[in-house]
Swiss-Prot record:
This is Nodulin-26B. Belongs to the nodulin 20 family. Residues 1-20 form the signal peptide. Induction: During nodulation in legume roots after Rhizobium infection. Pfam families: Nodulin. GO terms for biological process: nodulation. It comes from Glycine max (Soybean). Keywords: Nodulation, Signal.
């Protein structure tokens, strides 16, 4: 079982690394045609304006602004429920999450959490976007479910379409930051409007107009 778990981890990391590498070339990146994601790219610019126009010194650098763009767009995805499937969230921000003060460059991707040792790993897919994974402890005579160890008892593995989308967002955040920083007074300029056309046309270069609209906010 442990060998199988190691093989699965290796496979997931290989897929993630491959997708991240492929997305470095935006022209070759494959974007999941999900209308919720398209609308999220449009409406997420309000978060960009709110969180990334503070005038912080960290935002004056390309890496800092890119990280803030990515963080604010991901917050938008969560808050608007665009990452939900069957009322379950694909990923959840930490409790008490606040706008970041970027200091480091944007990571290539956010890896999935490690599989607990001595456990049985199982996944099943309930849609084309997400797979639900569970771990069952293999400790003799106890077989404790991970809801006693990891809180929820399951973790939503970032299935390939979502991972691709987040990877492209990461690449486009860097491109948007690079372009926006060439504008005068970037800290006080209407960053949301400035980055809107840049960011959306980067994510959906051949059909940015289809991303217009408003996202329904889910409780």
């Amino acid at each position: 079982m442990e060998k199988m778990x190691v093989m699965l981890i290796t496979l997931f990391l290989f897929i993630a690394a491959t997708v991240a590498e492929d997305a470095d070339n935006i022209g070759e990146a494959i974007i999941p045609e999900n209308p919720k994601f398209k609308k999220f790219v449009t409406d997420g610019t309000s978060h960009v304006a709110e969180r990334c126009s503070s005038g912080s010194e960290a935002l004056h650098g390309e890496g800092g602004l890119a990280l803030c763009l990515f963080d604010s767009m991901e917050n938008c995805l969560v808050e608007h429920g665009a990452a939900k499937v069957n009322q379950r969230s694909l990923f959840v921000l930490p409790k008490g999450s606040t706008p970041i003060e970027p200091k480091d460059s944007l990571p290539s991707f956010i890896p999935s959490p490690p599989i607990p040792p001595k456990s049985k790993f199982e996944c099943w897919c309930d849609s084309l976007i997400s797979c639900v994974c569970t771990w069952t402890s293999m400790v003799p005579s106890t077989r404790l479910l991970n809801n006693q160890q990891l809180g929820q008892g399951f973790y939503y593995f970032q299935y390939e379409p979502l991972l691709q989308f987040r990877t492209v967002l990461r690449t486009c955040s860097l491109e948007s930051a690079r372009t926006c920083l060439n504008a005068p007074n970037v800290a006080t300029s209407p960053l949301g409007r400035l980055s809107h056309s840049i960011h959306e046309s980067c994510v959906y270069p051949s059909g940015a107009e289809s991303g217009t609209g408003s996202l329904p906010i889910k409780a």
